[in-house]
C-alpha cells in the first residue's frame, strides 16, 4: 500500500475548503429559497399568481402594490405554479415550492405529516389572529396543538331544496318555512311526494368523477362507517364494513325502491347543478355557496333554500371542507412574518374600510348576477370578529 505525504498547510487548506463546502451545501439544504433581494427586503414568493392578463391578475397586482407600500421591508415575488399532487411533493423535496402556496383541507394533514408546511402558531399569535380564529376550522390545520396552515375559506355540506317544488308537494309549514327531513328515510319519503306531485326527481345524487364519493362520505359517516383506522404508524382502510354497505343500500334504494333519482344517473359536479338549476330535481346535498353554481341556469333566487343535512341511524354529521394557504417549511422567520401579513391583506378578522368596500362590491355584483346571497357560509373567524358581524349584517340587509 502506498502512502503519499501531504504538506500540512495544503492539508489545512483542503480541510477548510471542505468545511466551507459542507457549510454552503448545508445552508442550501436548509433553505434553497432566497431570503432577501438586492435592497435587503425579505422576499415572499406567492403561488397561484394569475398568468393571464385580466381582472384577477390586476387585482393581485393592486394588492401587491398596496402591501409593498405598507410593508417596505418585504417584496412580493409572483409564482404562477399552483398546487397539484403530481408536482407538489417533488418540488417540496427540492425546496422549490413558493413561500405561500394554496391547497385544500383534504391535503393538509398529509402535507403536515410530510413536514412541508411551516409552524405558524407563534406568528398568528404575535399578529393577534390566533384567538380570533374559528376553533373548529383551526383543528383541521393543527397537529399536536400547533397550527400549520391558514384557512381562508370553509364550508359544511347541507341540503339544498327547490322552494317551488316543495310547495307543490305540500311540504311547507303554515308560516312559509319548509318542512325538514329529520333523517334519510324521511328524505326518501319527501322525494316520493315531490315526484308524485310534480313528476320531477325528488333527489339528486352525483355518481361520476370524484363527486359521488365526496358526497357519499357524509352519508356513510351517518351510518357509522369508519373509512380508516390507524394501525401503528400506518393507516388501514376499514370501509369494507356492514355500516358502509347499509349506506350504499340506501343510495341503491333511492333508485330502485323509491325511484326518486333522475333518469340519467351519470351525474358529475356540473350536471348535478344543471339538474337542480333547471328545476329537474328538488333536493341536493351541497355547500352553502351552491347558489353561485346554478346562476347560469337562470334559477330564481327565491326558489332556492338551504337546510341542515338529515341525520343517519348512528350519527348526525356532515362534511366540512375548505381551502388553506400554507407556508413553505423552508421559510425563514422573517418570511413567515411577511407571509402572514400578506395573507392578512385579503383575509382579516378586522373591519377595515377596504374590507367594507370589497364586501359591498362583491355582494352587489352577485345580486346583479341574480345570485342568492342570504346563505352564510362557515367562516375562518369566530363569531366575535367585526368583519364577520359586518358581513352577516350586510347579507341580512340586502337579502333577496
Region annotations inferred by a language model:
Residues 2-17, 21-114, 125-131, 173, ...:
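Conserved N-terminal structural module of periplasmic/extracytoplasmic solute-binding proteins
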Residues 186-193, 233-265, 309:
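Glycine-centered hinge/linker elements that transmit conformational signals in sensory
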Amino acid at each position: 500500500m502506498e502512502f503519499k505525504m501531504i504538506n500540512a498547510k495544503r492539508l489545512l487548506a483542503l480541510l477548510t475548503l471542505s468545511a466551507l463546502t459542507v457549510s454552503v451545501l448545508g445552508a442550501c439544504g436548509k433553505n434553497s429559497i432566497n431570503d432577501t433581494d438586492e435592497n435587503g427586503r425579505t422576499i415572499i414568493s406567492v403561488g397561484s399568481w394569475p398568468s393571464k392578463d385580466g381582472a384577477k391578475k390586476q387585482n393581485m397586482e393592486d394588492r401587491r402594490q398596496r402591501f409593498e407600500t405598507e410593508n417596505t421591508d418585504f417584496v412580493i415575488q409572483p409564482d404562477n405554479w399552483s398546487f397539484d399532487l403530481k408536482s407538489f411533493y417533488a418540488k417540496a423535496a427540492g425546496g422549490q415550492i413558493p413561500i405561500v402556496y394554496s391547497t385544500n383541507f383534504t391535503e393538509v394533514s398529509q402535507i403536515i405529516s410530510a413536514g412541508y408546511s411551516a409552524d405558524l402558531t407563534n406568528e398568528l399569535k404575535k399578529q393577534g389572529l390566533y384567538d380570533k380564529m374559528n376553533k373548529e376550522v383551526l383543528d383541521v390545520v393543527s397537529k399536536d396543538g400547533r397550527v400549520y396552515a391558514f384557512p381562508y375559506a370553509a364550508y359544511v355540506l347541507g341540503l339544498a331544496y327547490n322552494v317551488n317544488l316543495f310547495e307543490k308537494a305540500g311540504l311547507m309549514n303554515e308560516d312559509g318555512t319548509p318542512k325538514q327531513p329529520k333523517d334519510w328515510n324521511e328524505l326518501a319519503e319527501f322525494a316520493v311526494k315531490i315526484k308524485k306531485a310534480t313528476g320531477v326527481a325528488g333527489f339528486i345524487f352525483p355518481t361520476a368523477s370524484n363527486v359521488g364519493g365526496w358526497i357519499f362520505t357524509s352519508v356513510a359517516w351517518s351510518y357509522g362507517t369508519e373509512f380508516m383506522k390507524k394501525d401503528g404508524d400506518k393507516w388501514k382502510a376499514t370501509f369494507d364494513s356492514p355500516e358502509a354497505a347499509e349506506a350504499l343500500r340506501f343510495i341503491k334504494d333511492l333508485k330502485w325502491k323509491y325511484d326518486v333519482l333522475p333518469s340519467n344517473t351519470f351525474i358529475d359536479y356540473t350536471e348535478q347543478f344543471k339538474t337542480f338549476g333547471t328545476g329537474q330535481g328538488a333536493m341536493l346535498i351541497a355547500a352553502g355557496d351552491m347558489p353561485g353554481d346554478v346562476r347560469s341556469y337562470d334559477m330564481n333566487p327565491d326558489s332556492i333554500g338551504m337546510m341542515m343535512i338529515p341525520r343517519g341511524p348512528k350519527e348526525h354529521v356532515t362534511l366540512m371542507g375548505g381551502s388553506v394557504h400554507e407556508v413553505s417549511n423552508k421559510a425563514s422567520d422573517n418570511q413567515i412574518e411577511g407571509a402572514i401579513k400578506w395573507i392578512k391583506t385579503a383575509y382579516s378578522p378586522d373591519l377595515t374600510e377596504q374590507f367594507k368596500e370589497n364586501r359591498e362590491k362583491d355582494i352587489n355584483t352577485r345580486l346583479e348576477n341574480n345570485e342568492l346571497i342570504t346563505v352564510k357560509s362557515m367562516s375562518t373567524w369566530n363569531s366575535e370578529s367585526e368583519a364577520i358581524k359586518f358581513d352577516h349584517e350586510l347579507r341580512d340587509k340586502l337579502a333577496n
